[in-house]
Amino acid sequence: MIHTLTTYESTTTDPYENLAVEEYLTFHVKPGECILYLWQNAHTVVIGRNQNCWKECRVSELEADGGHLVRRLSGGGAVYHDLGNLNFTFCMRKEDADVSRQLQVIIEAVGSFGLTAEKTGRNDVAINGQKFSGNAFFDSDGYYYHHGTLLLHVDTASMSRFLNPSKAKLQSKGVDSVRSRVVNLSSLCPDITVDTMKQAMFAAFSKVYGLPAMPLCTEHLDLDAIQKGRERFASDHWKYGQKIPFTNRLEQRFSWGEVNLDLHVNERQITEALLSSDSMEADWFSDIGTEFQGLPYRTDILCKALNRSLEQHLVPADIRADLCQMVQEQI
Protein backbone atom coordinates (compact mmCIF):
# COMPACT_ATOMS: atom_id res chain seq x y z
CA MET A 1 0.00 0.00 0.00
CA ILE A 2 1.23 3.47 -0.90
CA HIS A 3 1.82 5.56 2.23
CA THR A 4 4.56 7.97 1.06
CA LEU A 5 4.49 10.33 -1.92
CA THR A 6 7.66 11.89 -3.32
CA THR A 7 8.11 14.28 -6.24
CA TYR A 8 11.16 15.03 -8.33
CA GLU A 9 11.52 17.53 -11.16
CA SER A 10 14.40 17.20 -13.62
CA THR A 11 16.75 20.13 -14.06
CA THR A 12 18.01 19.08 -17.51
CA THR A 13 16.65 18.43 -20.99
CA ASP A 14 19.38 15.89 -21.77
CA PRO A 15 17.43 12.71 -22.66
CA TYR A 16 20.20 10.31 -21.65
CA GLU A 17 20.52 11.86 -18.21
CA ASN A 18 16.76 11.94 -17.77
CA LEU A 19 16.46 8.22 -18.49
CA ALA A 20 19.35 7.53 -16.15
CA VAL A 21 17.59 9.47 -13.38
CA GLU A 22 14.39 7.56 -14.10
CA GLU A 23 16.22 4.26 -13.78
CA TYR A 24 17.95 5.39 -10.57
CA LEU A 25 14.69 6.52 -8.95
CA THR A 26 12.97 3.28 -9.92
CA PHE A 27 15.60 1.03 -8.36
CA HIS A 28 15.85 3.15 -5.21
CA VAL A 29 12.15 3.60 -4.43
CA LYS A 30 11.20 2.38 -0.96
CA PRO A 31 8.39 -0.07 -0.13
CA GLY A 32 5.12 1.83 0.09
CA GLU A 33 6.57 4.87 -1.69
CA CYS A 34 5.44 6.33 -5.01
CA ILE A 35 7.68 8.85 -6.77
CA LEU A 36 6.25 11.20 -9.41
CA TYR A 37 9.10 12.31 -11.66
CA LEU A 38 8.53 15.08 -14.23
CA TRP A 39 11.02 15.68 -17.03
CA GLN A 40 11.49 17.06 -20.54
CA ASN A 41 13.71 16.06 -23.45
CA ALA A 42 14.92 18.42 -26.16
CA HIS A 43 14.51 17.29 -29.80
CA THR A 44 14.48 13.55 -29.18
CA VAL A 45 12.99 10.37 -30.58
CA VAL A 46 12.51 7.75 -27.88
CA ILE A 47 12.03 4.17 -29.03
CA GLY A 48 10.85 1.11 -27.12
CA ARG A 49 13.24 -1.49 -25.73
CA ASN A 50 12.56 -3.97 -28.54
CA GLN A 51 12.21 -1.63 -31.49
CA ASN A 52 14.27 -1.23 -34.63
CA CYS A 53 15.32 2.43 -34.62
CA TRP A 54 15.86 2.41 -38.40
CA LYS A 55 12.29 1.33 -38.95
CA GLU A 56 10.70 3.73 -36.49
CA CYS A 57 12.37 7.02 -37.38
CA ARG A 58 14.67 8.81 -39.77
CA VAL A 59 17.78 8.27 -37.66
CA SER A 60 20.31 9.93 -39.96
CA GLU A 61 18.09 12.96 -40.58
CA LEU A 62 17.33 13.32 -36.87
CA GLU A 63 20.99 13.23 -35.87
CA ALA A 64 22.03 15.55 -38.70
CA ASP A 65 19.45 18.02 -37.34
CA GLY A 66 21.05 17.90 -33.89
CA GLY A 67 18.44 15.55 -32.45
CA HIS A 68 18.89 12.59 -30.12
CA LEU A 69 17.93 8.95 -30.48
CA VAL A 70 17.13 7.23 -27.18
CA ARG A 71 16.22 3.62 -26.41
CA ARG A 72 14.27 3.31 -23.16
CA LEU A 73 13.91 0.36 -20.79
CA SER A 74 10.18 -0.08 -21.36
CA GLY A 75 8.50 -1.60 -24.38
CA GLY A 76 5.97 0.05 -26.65
CA GLY A 77 6.28 2.41 -29.58
CA ALA A 78 8.34 5.35 -30.75
CA VAL A 79 7.53 8.89 -29.58
CA TYR A 80 8.87 12.35 -30.37
CA HIS A 81 9.85 14.67 -27.52
CA ASP A 82 10.57 18.38 -27.57
CA LEU A 83 10.12 21.15 -25.02
CA GLY A 84 6.40 21.29 -25.81
CA ASN A 85 6.10 17.84 -24.26
CA LEU A 86 6.06 17.06 -20.53
CA ASN A 87 7.00 13.53 -19.48
CA PHE A 88 5.96 11.84 -16.26
CA THR A 89 7.08 8.68 -14.48
CA PHE A 90 5.48 6.91 -11.52
CA CYS A 91 8.17 4.86 -9.74
CA MET A 92 7.14 2.28 -7.13
CA ARG A 93 7.40 -1.34 -6.08
CA LYS A 94 5.56 -3.77 -8.34
CA GLU A 95 3.07 -4.81 -5.65
CA ASP A 96 1.95 -1.18 -5.26
CA ALA A 97 1.25 -0.59 -8.95
CA ASP A 98 -2.30 0.38 -9.90
CA VAL A 99 -2.53 1.55 -13.50
CA SER A 100 -6.06 2.90 -13.16
CA ARG A 101 -5.07 5.00 -10.16
CA GLN A 102 -1.93 6.24 -11.88
CA LEU A 103 -3.87 7.22 -15.01
CA GLN A 104 -6.42 8.95 -12.79
CA VAL A 105 -3.67 11.40 -11.80
CA ILE A 106 -3.37 12.39 -15.49
CA ILE A 107 -7.13 12.63 -15.92
CA GLU A 108 -7.47 14.71 -12.74
CA ALA A 109 -4.65 17.07 -13.75
CA VAL A 110 -6.18 17.70 -17.17
CA GLY A 111 -9.62 18.00 -15.59
CA SER A 112 -8.40 20.92 -13.48
CA PHE A 113 -8.30 22.90 -16.74
CA GLY A 114 -11.91 22.05 -17.53
CA LEU A 115 -11.07 19.24 -19.98
CA THR A 116 -12.59 15.77 -19.83
CA ALA A 117 -10.07 13.04 -20.57
CA GLU A 118 -10.45 9.27 -20.60
CA LYS A 119 -8.34 6.14 -20.89
CA THR A 120 -8.52 4.61 -24.36
CA GLY A 121 -6.99 1.71 -26.24
CA ARG A 122 -3.65 0.45 -25.03
CA ASN A 123 -3.34 2.64 -21.94
CA ASP A 124 -3.50 5.91 -23.87
CA VAL A 125 -5.30 8.97 -22.54
CA ALA A 126 -7.39 11.00 -24.96
CA ILE A 127 -9.92 13.80 -25.27
CA ASN A 128 -12.73 13.21 -27.77
CA GLY A 129 -10.75 10.39 -29.31
CA GLN A 130 -7.60 12.45 -29.77
CA LYS A 131 -4.58 11.10 -27.91
CA PHE A 132 -2.41 13.42 -25.81
CA SER A 133 -0.75 10.84 -23.58
CA GLY A 134 0.85 7.52 -24.51
CA ASN A 135 1.97 5.24 -21.68
CA ALA A 136 4.46 2.40 -21.24
CA PHE A 137 5.58 0.18 -18.37
CA PHE A 138 8.69 -1.51 -16.99
CA ASP A 139 9.31 -3.88 -14.11
CA SER A 140 12.33 -5.81 -12.91
CA ASP A 141 13.02 -7.67 -9.65
CA GLY A 142 9.95 -6.17 -8.02
CA TYR A 143 10.72 -2.59 -9.07
CA TYR A 144 8.30 -0.87 -11.44
CA TYR A 145 7.68 2.28 -13.40
CA HIS A 146 4.84 3.65 -15.48
CA HIS A 147 5.78 6.57 -17.70
CA GLY A 148 4.24 8.56 -20.49
CA THR A 149 3.94 11.75 -22.46
CA LEU A 150 1.77 14.82 -22.10
CA LEU A 151 1.51 16.68 -25.40
CA LEU A 152 1.18 20.36 -24.54
CA HIS A 153 2.44 22.24 -27.59
CA VAL A 154 4.67 19.75 -29.39
CA ASP A 155 5.96 20.60 -32.86
CA THR A 156 3.77 18.15 -34.77
CA ALA A 157 5.59 18.89 -38.03
CA SER A 158 8.82 17.62 -36.49
CA MET A 159 6.93 14.69 -35.01
CA SER A 160 5.76 13.65 -38.47
CA ARG A 161 9.10 14.43 -40.06
CA PHE A 162 11.22 12.28 -37.78
CA LEU A 163 8.80 9.50 -36.80
CA ASN A 164 7.62 8.64 -40.29
CA PRO A 165 10.09 6.30 -41.99
CA SER A 166 10.84 6.53 -45.68
CA LYS A 167 8.64 4.74 -48.19
CA ALA A 168 11.31 2.10 -48.74
CA LYS A 169 10.07 -1.38 -47.95
CA LEU A 170 11.59 -1.87 -44.54
CA GLN A 171 11.02 -5.32 -43.11
CA SER A 172 11.90 -6.19 -39.55
CA LYS A 173 11.23 -8.42 -36.57
CA GLY A 174 11.06 -5.33 -34.34
CA VAL A 175 7.86 -3.97 -32.82
CA ASP A 176 5.93 -1.43 -34.90
CA SER A 177 4.70 1.80 -33.35
CA VAL A 178 0.97 2.33 -33.50
CA ARG A 179 0.23 5.67 -35.17
CA SER A 180 -2.61 7.54 -33.53
CA ARG A 181 -4.35 10.83 -33.96
CA VAL A 182 -2.84 13.24 -31.46
CA VAL A 183 -3.77 16.61 -30.01
CA ASN A 184 -1.84 19.33 -28.21
CA LEU A 185 -3.57 20.24 -24.95
CA SER A 186 -2.73 23.93 -25.35
CA SER A 187 -4.90 23.97 -28.48
CA LEU A 188 -7.86 22.97 -26.29
CA CYS A 189 -7.01 25.27 -23.38
CA PRO A 190 -4.58 28.22 -23.76
CA ASP A 191 -4.01 28.22 -19.98
CA ILE A 192 -2.06 24.98 -20.28
CA THR A 193 1.70 25.53 -20.27
CA VAL A 194 4.57 23.37 -19.08
CA ASP A 195 4.64 25.17 -15.73
CA THR A 196 0.88 25.10 -15.13
CA MET A 197 0.73 21.41 -16.07
CA LYS A 198 3.57 20.57 -13.69
CA GLN A 199 1.67 22.20 -10.84
CA ALA A 200 -1.55 20.45 -11.89
CA MET A 201 0.23 17.08 -11.94
CA PHE A 202 1.71 17.54 -8.47
CA ALA A 203 -1.67 18.66 -7.08
CA ALA A 204 -3.51 15.75 -8.73
CA PHE A 205 -0.90 13.31 -7.41
CA SER A 206 -1.68 14.30 -3.81
CA LYS A 207 -5.42 14.43 -4.44
CA VAL A 208 -5.72 10.98 -6.04
CA TYR A 209 -3.58 9.26 -3.39
CA GLY A 210 -4.95 11.34 -0.51
CA LEU A 211 -1.48 12.09 0.84
CA PRO A 212 0.89 15.06 0.95
CA ALA A 213 3.88 14.83 -1.40
CA MET A 214 7.41 15.77 -0.40
CA PRO A 215 9.93 17.00 -2.99
CA LEU A 216 13.20 15.13 -3.41
CA CYS A 217 16.35 17.25 -3.55
CA THR A 218 19.07 16.57 -6.12
CA GLU A 219 21.73 16.27 -3.40
CA HIS A 220 20.01 13.10 -2.22
CA LEU A 221 20.76 11.37 -5.54
CA ASP A 222 23.90 9.38 -6.33
CA LEU A 223 25.20 11.52 -9.20
CA ASP A 224 28.06 9.13 -10.00
CA ALA A 225 25.62 6.26 -10.49
CA ILE A 226 23.41 8.47 -12.65
CA GLN A 227 26.39 9.51 -14.79
CA LYS A 228 27.25 5.86 -15.40
CA GLY A 229 23.65 5.24 -16.40
CA ARG A 230 23.74 8.21 -18.73
CA GLU A 231 26.84 6.88 -20.46
CA ARG A 232 25.12 3.54 -21.04
CA PHE A 233 21.94 5.09 -22.46
CA ALA A 234 24.02 7.35 -24.74
CA SER A 235 26.26 4.54 -26.01
CA ASP A 236 26.00 3.33 -29.60
CA HIS A 237 25.77 -0.24 -28.33
CA TRP A 238 22.58 0.55 -26.40
CA LYS A 239 21.01 2.84 -29.01
CA TYR A 240 21.77 0.87 -32.17
CA GLY A 241 23.27 -2.43 -31.11
CA GLN A 242 20.12 -4.37 -30.41
CA LYS A 243 20.09 -7.69 -32.24
CA ILE A 244 17.14 -6.93 -34.51
CA PRO A 245 18.11 -7.89 -38.08
CA PHE A 246 16.22 -6.17 -40.89
CA THR A 247 16.23 -5.53 -44.60
CA ASN A 248 15.82 -2.10 -46.14
CA ARG A 249 14.92 -1.92 -49.81
CA LEU A 250 15.81 1.38 -51.45
CA GLU A 251 14.03 1.77 -54.76
CA GLN A 252 13.56 4.61 -57.19
CA ARG A 253 12.94 5.19 -60.88
CA PHE A 254 15.18 7.67 -62.69
CA SER A 255 15.18 8.90 -66.28
CA TRP A 256 17.93 6.38 -67.06
CA GLY A 257 16.31 3.38 -65.34
CA GLU A 258 14.92 1.83 -62.16
CA VAL A 259 17.18 0.93 -59.23
CA ASN A 260 16.68 -1.49 -56.34
CA LEU A 261 19.16 -1.69 -53.47
CA ASP A 262 18.47 -4.32 -50.80
CA LEU A 263 20.53 -3.83 -47.64
CA HIS A 264 20.53 -6.66 -45.10
CA VAL A 265 21.55 -5.25 -41.72
CA ASN A 266 22.37 -6.85 -38.39
CA GLU A 267 23.60 -4.89 -35.35
CA ARG A 268 24.02 -1.76 -37.47
CA GLN A 269 26.33 -3.47 -39.96
CA ILE A 270 25.53 -4.41 -43.55
CA THR A 271 25.80 -8.17 -43.96
CA GLU A 272 24.66 -8.29 -47.59
CA ALA A 273 23.90 -5.73 -50.29
CA LEU A 274 22.18 -6.45 -53.60
CA LEU A 275 22.03 -3.69 -56.22
CA SER A 276 19.97 -4.23 -59.36
CA SER A 277 18.68 -2.10 -62.22
CA ASP A 278 17.05 -2.27 -65.64
CA SER A 279 19.42 0.45 -66.83
CA MET A 280 21.44 -0.01 -70.01
CA GLU A 281 24.43 0.90 -67.81
CA ALA A 282 23.90 -2.18 -65.63
CA ASP A 283 27.23 -4.00 -66.12
CA TRP A 284 28.81 -2.50 -63.00
CA PHE A 285 25.77 -2.72 -60.69
CA SER A 286 26.58 -6.10 -59.11
CA ASP A 287 30.11 -4.96 -58.26
CA ILE A 288 28.83 -1.84 -56.49
CA GLY A 289 26.56 -3.85 -54.20
CA THR A 290 29.29 -6.14 -52.91
CA GLU A 291 31.38 -3.16 -51.77
CA PHE A 292 28.74 -2.24 -49.17
CA GLN A 293 29.18 -5.50 -47.27
CA GLY A 294 30.69 -5.06 -43.82
CA LEU A 295 30.13 -1.30 -43.69
CA PRO A 296 28.27 0.41 -40.83
CA TYR A 297 24.65 1.28 -41.64
CA ARG A 298 25.25 5.03 -41.73
CA THR A 299 24.25 7.44 -44.46
CA ASP A 300 27.53 9.35 -44.55
CA ILE A 301 29.70 6.22 -44.77
CA LEU A 302 27.52 4.58 -47.42
CA CYS A 303 27.41 7.74 -49.54
CA LYS A 304 31.21 8.06 -49.47
CA ALA A 305 31.68 4.38 -50.34
CA LEU A 306 29.10 4.58 -53.11
CA ASN A 307 30.54 7.72 -54.66
CA ARG A 308 34.08 6.33 -54.53
CA SER A 309 33.03 3.08 -56.17
CA LEU A 310 30.99 4.82 -58.85
CA GLU A 311 33.95 7.03 -59.74
CA GLN A 312 36.22 3.99 -59.99
CA HIS A 313 33.76 2.39 -62.41
CA LEU A 314 33.61 5.61 -64.46
CA VAL A 315 29.88 5.94 -63.93
CA PRO A 316 28.44 9.13 -65.49
CA ALA A 317 28.11 12.08 -63.11
CA ASP A 318 24.32 12.33 -63.42
CA ILE A 319 23.85 8.68 -62.41
CA ARG A 320 26.31 9.10 -59.51
CA ALA A 321 24.36 12.10 -58.25
CA ASP A 322 21.02 10.27 -58.51
CA LEU A 323 22.22 7.19 -56.63
CA CYS A 324 23.87 9.19 -53.85
CA GLN A 325 20.73 11.26 -53.41
CA MET A 326 18.62 8.09 -53.20
CA VAL A 327 20.81 6.74 -50.39
CA GLN A 328 20.73 10.08 -48.53
CA GLU A 329 16.94 10.31 -48.72
CA GLN A 330 16.01 6.72 -47.95
CA ILE A 331 18.34 5.76 -45.10
Place the predicted regions along the sequence by residue.
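Short, glycine/charge-rich beta-strand/loop segments that flank catalytic centers
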Residues: 40-43, 119-129
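FAD-binding core of FAD-dependent oxidoreductases
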Residues: 72-87, 122-128, 136-143
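Long, positively charged amphipathic alpha-helical accessory segments at protein N-termini or as interdomain linkers
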Residues: 106, 114, 133, 141-240, ...
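Structured beta-strand/loop patches that form or line metal/cofactor-binding pockets in enzymes
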Residues: 222-266
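N-terminal lobe of the biotin/lipoate ligase/transferase fold
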Residues: 1-97
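Short beta-strand elements
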Residues: 136-137, 149-152, 252, 259-277
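Contiguous, small/hydrophobic- and glycine-enriched helical/loop subdomains that border
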Residues: 85-123
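A generic structural motif
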Residues: 92-96, 186-191, 277-281
